């Protein structure tokens, strides 16, 4: 690499500052609860239509007029392009090329199938092809045109021994393959010789030189023509199924017409379709001398098809309003009318005698196909049919669904005959229009509706719109009957509406879908600007759509912002990235994913994810199935919180299964178990292989390091999410908490229980004596498969809530798989909340209050005091608890067992004598005589003696290990040490009654601990677990003997502690070693810490007796409500019904868009996403967390609801959103606070026009507010990464390949990895989030000085960011802040009336002393104190 460019990032040299504007902040108003009316207003957009088309079309007509007239064309045949010697030969009449040797080599049978309708037009077709450059053939499905017309051409070549090379396009891969195989079978040719196929890069061409008839997909031919820029490799080009008007087909027509008019005038083009608009196509290819002839090969049907409309169905009284062309949809009355139609059909067949068929025979042959627009409508129709079945027992039917997301088993069910006595009713979307033919369908009910995907090119948000179907669609649907017998079609609209209002043809894909790939093809073709090329389309798009597409391509790095150095809003020079994207059969963002995968050396992972996002239906549709189906998303996501990671893991599992040679039946069972589609996975596998081959051809190969630069799975997971964030910029969303302000409400709603383990129901009645129904509440979770013994059910005192807390039991029932979920939250919480999506109302039968009171009195359950029931409870002797006293700050003792830094057990040295005495008592030979002889005597929860380190200690049985029945072992937990061991019966002893009397109720002589104020660093943490190195440091400390703990807080009997070292403490050391990062303690912990500090400050003024009393009250308050698991009353006594709502969680959260186009919209997550149940996975952490969506769709009346699809929760690394934005955005503006002492927000986008100061792409401008410190050195590191990413594919103008070689790539990868690691592992100070009203305003970045140097100039995809200079905070301001801080500490122990005040360091309004105390404990305030130099105790 150029040394001068490398010196640009040499940190040993002086950092020269460049002046830049001191811009002010913009912010995501929703994410930080800031109101701004301006942001709620929609962006004003100027839509430019099709006036631009006229001039380009006229020029093209002049070219078309140069095509030779028919008498000139008659004797001509093509040379191959390779035979041409000069451009002049294009204008000359080419010599006739013979191919006699080829024709002698293969057997040619000239007897064609005369029974096919197309045969009658054979001579007419051949003559038309010989006499015209373009011929249009219209023929119904089944007439034989696809297989026969190319053979007719080839047969003519055989007769005259003239050279033929025919290519035939098909819109679908499977069609190209099956038709080629059928032709080979018919002609008795070996596959891949005379006739073959090519789909993607997959070819069946055994002898490529001999192939004269090639069937391929539309995209394959388009790529060939774009690369060759001529048609002359072929003599005949046959475009089949032209009516489908896919985007590739429309652009292929542009290319063919242009090449016909320039350098390929002697190639023959044949356009074929069943429902073609011949006049439109004929006009498109016409010149001033002639127009292409249209040959109609339609034929009459052998069976009649009767069509009926809504107003013709006299026996059905259709009530309600008339159809509205502007309001497509199905009313309840519409569904009911369809049901009535079905009943009429059934009744008609019961009474029909003239056909001579029995009713059972009519049932077999009389299946009904109902065309519905989508899966939601299929579900509604299904529900209506079920209701009908419940009320009408005469008619029996078998319901079958048919849509694109079906599993293979469901697809097969469509073709299976219904059981005897049952009528088959198929409910289908438009997938059944042409792809599927079911032989036994005799009736069609058509609502004349469909759902079509439209994309708003301004925002790039897609929406699935419900529209009226075209007449062409309706005719295709009607064509599903009348093939084997007479049929009937019932259209659920009036005849006049059908004839007058429905359009003849559907909206072409080019007018409703993204145009990125077409624009890239136009740039690769180099025959005009994208605007010029797309103006020549059969249906040209709006100019504004083309310009918006150009902006999108500039955003993803496919185009440079300029053309020959000049900015053009409707054009841009193609980048090497764009060249790669044009070669990949993917959406441009997925191609960007592969490019970034190559740069970050995660190429194969990127290919797999891109393929998985392209192929639909990998997971069987889970919206109507149980929670077990949805839970499989979690199984494969494996705690990543990413649908994309889930796709990657699904594929790896599938690949492993294939490599192990799993039998077909076993594969089907595997797919059923995990609710996967083998068909979709097989298609995905083909695409993965295709993409790998394409990448290899593009020289995109992974680096094979001797030792991987990524040290472990956690770092790989981070890097994978980095490229996901980079690929799908700017689809960035900020996760917001359900509780605003502090996290107090999070705990108050659930009465102080652990929100990471607790869900709750509402609408319960406090007078109902809820403790009687705990077992019934536990039975509300059948679909979740959560064992009742893993739940504690408690009730809010005086509230209408029921709390369900899931136990921290690390041992799962046998046969279950442990599933990782993001963060600290229990998997059962996700399962319970997902239950609400299927049913949010749960019935609970209870007794009447007076009957219940009598019941508990009679059964002597608890006590009744003054008419109020007090449930039974287990008494706790708080004076015997080993928990730390409220007055103790420092405790010395031993760490007896370590699970991790987040869970270990501590034994205070004050209990050493007690432990020694107990051990001596337990190990008395007399006590060890009670050997266990019967394994059945040992049950879960039993207290006994178990052997530990050579001595017996008291333990409780956790569970029985039944894996080995001959040698039963038991998992036991040592009560006074905290560890769990798996022991045989020989190492267990039953406790005598004397021992049980003394020690059964004695609390453990230890307490559980976790490290305070720190959490695992995401860069080294998998599943939010503490890294092994951190645990090893704690183990080493424990082995040293006595340990000194500083108690921070005690919450739910778990102490948050700091472990003192000779210098500092372990908590700080872990942060320094980057194994942990600083974090806030949650609200309950801060409350307890504040209470403990105040009690400890007055310890010297309180007597020993009073201290003991206060501590007992303190410990008693720490005990949680108990679930006594009472037996419920008899069902016959429970006569009242309560409808519970829920379950809910206080951790539920929503997301808000950072993009301007999404600011005023409601944002939801796709129900099929692993993040549909979105929770705050680190509730104590106040940092903004980012969610990235692979795609976004809009819905709602005004498209004001966004649905995020294929989402990924980004790592919980402070500043991650800001860092990703700065690395991957095209251009950014760093905004400083008013004092210019720190950066407070980032405005990112395509930039602005230097004269007008207007944003180039306002819709996609986004703002990230900073809640942690990002400094100048961080931006310099980011610039280094951007420069290195540019270096990978940088090529000089005119060069075809990048200049970076393999050695350069290794250097680049190492530099990127090191810089990124430094950025993401840096411990950052918290800063005040500082939103202002001047959002999304670009400042002149050059008015205050020279811009930063750009190493690659205008050929840079990632230009360097300007780094505004920061200043030290004004000393007077600092002194004011220190005074304000001192004032707050003076108020800390204030007991009188308090006037609300503001913490000026944090800009936090404080209404009470208690709020002030807790605020002083937040990490934000502590960091700000350190920043201003306030002396802290």
Curated annotation (Swiss-Prot):
The Helicase C-terminal domain, residue ranges: 355-526
Organism: Drosophila pseudoobscura pseudoobscura
The protein's name: Probable ATP-dependent RNA helicase spindle-E
Compartment list: Cytoplasm
GO molecular function: ATP binding; ATP hydrolysis activity; RNA binding; RNA helicase activity
Keyword Ribosomal protein: no
CDD domains: SF2_C_RHA (cd18791)
Enzyme Commission identifier(s): 3.6.4.13
Every Helicase ATP-binding domain range: 126-294
Any one GO biological process: spermatogenesis
Major location (coarse): cytoplasm
Domain Tudor: 935-998
Role description: Probable ATP-binding RNA helicase which plays a central role during spermatogenesis and oogenesis by repressing transposable elements and preventing their mobilization, which is essential for the germline integrity. Acts via the piRNA metabolic process, which mediates the repression of transposable elements during meiosis by forming complexes composed of piRNAs and Piwi and govern the methylation and subsequent repression of transposons. Involved in the repression of LTR retrotransposon copia.
Record-listed ATP binding positions: 139-146
